[in-house]
């Protein structure tokens, strides 16, 4: 009757092993999937950077989610090389084409002086609060810690800023800056879900702060009860990883764009009109900026405000939530953000369509020869673009430094 020794010897014949040195070479190529098949307590004590946790006890259930590419070289390791050998055999039976078990496991890797790390440490309450994130391979513990360390600035605590702030706070984005000089009005409550009836007359920043801190005490709310302007935008935007654009006027959008390019801070742009909404991501010098898309604002009669034209109350929820999604993708470096892509939503049709956007080489802000090198009179520019251009001949400029 076969013994365990016989069983394991048979497995070793069917799998491929590699030394820690060889595995390190494979990791440098970036062409492998790296899986740690140890248990949770072992993983928490330290693991190889770039590895995903796929404990052998859940291997069959979790493998296809956490190690999704069956045709890619997959390297597994455990503490000493036994469990990873068995796991490699299992993955081969599940259709993985090139599976390698690291001989000697994590112990040999660590003893030979190779790099390793400990995962982010969460409090018991945080582990419970973010448990659904921790289960997602693209987020996990490292991603959740990245969110907790991130800083997002929201322009406006209104229709778009409300749902975006709600979901960024619930996701655990560590610092949310909110810029808004307005107060809560009864007409806001049809769509601005950060605010409540008893807060009518209260500043929107104060109301938003109360709501978000009650939702998630992990999140630091920084309020700016001031209108965004050329005089304060450099001070406000400094230190933030990205900006959510919930502005409701063109001067602020152009100002934000120019500051975004100057500081190289991505902007997740959203806009709404009655039953229609649009979302895109302006990532400086990796895609078009707002001026590439809109060299000048439309006449006021073609772009009325929500107060003038109205808006379906739930529409900002759809668009603002997409903005929050794009922000999280950018912060985590996952997926395909809407850079160079303009997503349009029609609520009446229940349809989405996408338009591809390109950088304008003649763009006065991010083009090859920019003519706008400082903040301008945005009110004057938006009131009469042609007159403004006539009064401001291009000056000699230098390209923003890389």
Spans of model-derived segments:
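Rhodanese-like catalytic fold shared by cysteine-dependent sulfurtransferases
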Residues: 1-33, 40-75, 79-145, 188, ...
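Glycine-rich, N-terminal phosphate-binding loop of Rossmann-like dinucleotide-binding domains
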Residues: 37, 78, 246-248
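Short beta-strand "acidic-cap" motif of Rossmann-like dinucleotide-binding folds
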Residues: 34-36, 101, 175-180
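Adenine nucleotide-associated cytosolic modules
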Residues: 61, 70-72, 93, 111, ...
